């Protein structure tokens, strides 16, 4: 099949859509990708990309179209609004100019927040005659309502109507959990076109050279490891409170990752010396962190949409065969 994948995030950024593209190409499909310039999560375009952009025009022989949408920058509400809007506008403009005469069988949207990226898929499909599919990884806009990112009642109604319209106009909806499927099916009164596609464990390299020279994992301690995004949904202020309460115990908390809430968390006040922040690390280092952990941590804020979410890291944690500590409903 000839497949166009539309995703705001793509290699060299670390998202599972990279593995989807690789799998489809190795399975013999003709795949193209429409994406932005890599800048997640720090909001700055990757230096390697800027110095040699031609190296990022193909991924496992899949052609990659790059849009110069505005980066996330500091990740404020305004920054993210401009970032999302910029990508949506430029993806519609580019696809109608360059891709509308292509005979795609499927236009597939990688549905991270906000799922408005699928608007491009729906519009383009009217010209190409393609079927459309979306993999929904966030129950947007429900999740931003629960996090109080959007409070205005008029905007809430408009975004809710927009999302329901997107679902109804999409041919196949893949939900990341059974509760996602139930939620979406009820909204559009159509169970048949909503299927479940769970996330899978990340493919982690075995870094036998042990490049993690700065890891301070002492055998006398219970070493708790968290990997991934530190955003509003992760409820990290609660994690910090618990860690501070355990300060007199032989427990260390190793936080690998970054996110828009990291600076806010650090500015909350006293943070135990037993909470160690490693920042953003290369994917090739993750296996060493997991192998040295005694316990792996998952944390999510409470809410109906959030409670329906299966964090992507859970499958990877399960594969590590290490106890998991969850602050999650």
Report residues per predicted region.
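Carbohydrate-associated surface elements
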Residues: 37, 179, 197-200
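Acidic anion/phosphate-binding donor-loop and adjacent secondary structure
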Residues: 185-191, 195, 200-220, 235
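Conserved donor-binding/catalytic core segment of Leloir-type glycosyltransferases
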Residues: 216-234, 240-243, 254
């Amino acid at each position: 099949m000839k497949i166009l994948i539309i995703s705001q995030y793509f290699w060299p950024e670390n998202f599972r859509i990279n593995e989807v593209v690789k799998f489809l190409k190795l399975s013999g499909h003709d795949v193209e990708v429409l994406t932005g310039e890599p800048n997640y999560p720090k909001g700055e375009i990757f230096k390697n990309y800027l110095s040699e952009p031609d190296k990022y025009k193909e991924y496992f022989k899949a052609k990659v179209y790059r849009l110069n949408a505005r980066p996330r920058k500091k990740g404020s509400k305004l920054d993210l609004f401009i970032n999302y809007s910029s990508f949506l506008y430029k993806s519609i403009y580019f696809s109608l100019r360059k891709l509308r005469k292509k005979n795609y069988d499927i236009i597939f949207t990688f549905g991270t927040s906000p799922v408005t990226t699928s608007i491009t898929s729906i519009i383009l499909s009217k010209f190409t005659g393609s079927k459309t599919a979306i993999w929904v990884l966030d129950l947007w806009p429900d999740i931003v309502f629960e996090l109080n990112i959007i409070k205005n009642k008029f905007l809430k109604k408009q975004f809710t109507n927009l999302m329901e319209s997107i679902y109804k106009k999409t041919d196949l909806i893949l939900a990341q959990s059974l509760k996602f499927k139930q939620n979406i099916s009820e909204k559009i009164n159509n169970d048949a076109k909503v299927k479940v596609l769970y996330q899978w464990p990340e493919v982690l390299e075995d870094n036998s050279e042990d490049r993690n020279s700065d890891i301070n994992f002492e055998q006398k301690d219970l070493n708790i490891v968290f990997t991934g995004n530190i955003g509003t949904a992760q409820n990290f202020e609660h994690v910090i409170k618990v860690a501070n309460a355990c300060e007199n115990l032989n427990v260390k908390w190793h936080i690998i990752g970054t996110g828009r809430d990291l600076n806010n968390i650090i500015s909350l006040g006293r943070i135990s010396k037993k909470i160690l922040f490693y920042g953003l690390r290369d994917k090739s280092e993750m296996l060493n962190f997991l192998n040295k952990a005694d316990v792996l941590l998952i944390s999510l804020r409470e809410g109906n949409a959030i409670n329906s979410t299966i964090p992507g890291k859970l499958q990877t944690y399960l594969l590590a065969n290490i106890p998991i500590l969850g602050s999650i409903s």
